[in-house]
Curated annotation (Swiss-Prot):
Classification of source organism: Eukaryota, Viridiplantae, Streptophyta, Embryophyta, Tracheophyta
Compartments, as annotated in UniProt: Mitochondrion inner membrane
Domain of life, per lineage: Eukaryota
Name of the protein: ATP synthase subunit a
Organism of provenance: Nicotiana tabacum (Common tobacco)
Transmembrane segments: 153-173, 246-266, 273-293, 313-333, 339-359
Amino acid sequence: MFRRIFLFDEDSLNSSVTSYTNASQSTTTIMDYSLKSSDTQGSSSGIFTDHPGLNPCSERIVELQYDIRLKLGALMPKESAQKVLEASEALHGESNNIAFLEYLLEDLQQNGVGGEAYKDAVDLSKDLVSSPLEQFEIISLIPMKIGNLYFSFTNPSLFMLLTLSLVLLLVYFVTKKGGGNSVPNAWQSLVELIYDFVLNPVNEQIGGLSGNVKQKFSPRISVTFTFSLFCNPQGMIPYSFTVTSHFLITLGLSFSIFIGITIVGFQKNGLHFLSFLLPAGVPLPLAPFLVLLELIPYCFRALSSGIRLFANMMAGHSSVKILSGFAWTMLCMNDLLYFIGDLGPLFIVLALTGLELGVAISQAHVSTILICIYLNDAINLHQSASFFIIEQKRV
């Protein structure tokens, strides 16, 4: 369902006058599904509950514009609903000329894709500037609906499954001979590098535990690191989708990690885990304020981790798309001066692509470091790992 804006005159909105005048003064927002109500179409009482005085002429305009969009959708089965909407709006231009709208609809119905109206819609929609945020659009691949709940299989679900399958296949082929080769090949070296890369922050950032206990956290952290490592640069591949560019996905990932770390803190320290909310020696009157000040930043860890990853991925990929489109536009110009000057934007796009690839990989590393720091805070109640190293040297 799409929210549309149509122009009507003030008289048509406030009365049931059947005469139609030029629309120029006010706007009203409607939902397209309102047009499906057969008992309200063509009646002077109006088809919209927010404007009961909408006259039949204005209703007819809305019906014709809606029918044009439906007909274009039938003629463009491979295009998305958003593309069909853009083509229909470019064709009729939100016109309030009933004769013109009837002509467009009649041409689409009689001539189809060979008609002048369809060709104009396709040509006009090509001239529209595409948004750099279109790459983050969620598309329903397999629609599924149970009651009022939607369980559609979308493109983020597809690429998450592809990422999971790729990681599992990589690990399977490396370990299928019972632990790998004594002389590692390139793929085995990659898996071992990922494992060592995660193990080092675990040993450095988490203190107060033996090495064997620390390594119990390594598989869980490795899964998070590997998922981010493969999902973040995924959007740099043409016609792919950046899973971590959506806030709900990154928030779900960070929130689940936050809950797990909190559970580990309670398992390790019991109710004494809550002592980090109130430092020792604080006067009693200040206790409520300090508890609140400590609790808010602690809870915001889940939110900040999700926002950081989402914002970096969306901003970086959008910048690459904008500059790439700019460079391509200059390259397509026939002027020699533009072609020579286009080398600058091309180099900028190349440098920005490398920078975005580095940011995508570094975000996985940053997430791993933060998880280890949060784990250390939960286990040792905000005592750094260096404190335990100094204590061990003293002993």
